[in-house]
Regions:
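P-loop (Walker A) phosphate-binding loop of NTP-binding proteins
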Residues: 11
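Small-molecule kinase domains that catalyze NTP-dependent phosphoryl transfer to phosphate-bearing small molecules
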Residues: 124-168
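ATP-binding Walker
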Residues: 14
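Conserved substrate/cofactor phosphate-moiety recognition/catalytic segment
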Residues: 21-66
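Hydrophobic anchor at the beta1->P-loop junction of P-loop NTPases
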Residues: 8
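Walker A/P-loop
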Residues: 17
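Glycine-rich phosphate-binding loop used to anchor ATP phosphates in small-molecule kinases
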Residues: 61-103
Length: 174
């Protein structure tokens, strides 16, 4: 397998963090950049506008751009040192665009189980991690209909055990 930069995204409960972490551990020299870890580095001064109907997430464009730039620079540094790179998590289009200003993504995968499955998985999460039915439904709709994700290879993980999903992702990398 040649060196790669892999993007794994999908709605909450799709398995992206679990797949990325376990896949990275199976490879010889790999890093897993979790987008949530980078987003959560913003401790204060986080712009949120819940009243903007054009931006239901509430995130400002500059924050998405900054997160994308940061992930892109981090991924580029690891790739230059010979690491395979997995970027996992939810990012919007401006963030992905900024990631790709710094590094080319070899493969883009969208884990997209059926809505009923992500709702079920979210309900099984600890309260401080659960998003709730309404948010999970909206999140799933975004990934199902946003034209930006047409360039991602879709993988329905509804009935896949994690190991089966990892095997499918590995096959896509060959």
């Amino acid at each position: 397998m040649n060196q790669f930069v892999l993007a794994i995204t999908g709605p909450a409960g799709s398995g992206k963090s679990t797949v990325a972490e376990k896949l990275a551990k199976q490879l010889d020299k790999c890093v897993n950049i979790d987008a949530d870890h980078v987003k959560h580095m913003i401790v204060s001064g986080f712009f949120v506008d819940k009243n903007d109907p054009k931006n239901p997430s509430g995130w400002g464009f500059n924050q998405w751009g900054l997160v994308g730039d940061s992930i892109g620079l981090l991924a580029s540094n690891f790739a230059k040192s010979g690491y395979d790179v997995i970027i996992n998590g939810y990012l919007d289009e401006p963030a992905w665009t900024n990631v790709e200003k710094h590094i080319s993504i070899t493969k883009k995968i969208l884990l997209l189980p059926q809505l009923s499955k992500v709702v079920e998985r979210d309900a099984g999460r600890p309260a401080d991690f659960a998003m709730g039915h309404q948010s999970v439904t909206k999140h799933h709709e975004t990934f199902s209909s946003d034209s930006y994700y047409r360039n991602f290879t879709k993988l329905d993980t509804t009935d896949h055990p994690i190991d089966e999903t990892i095997a499918a992702v590995k096959e896509m990398l060959h």
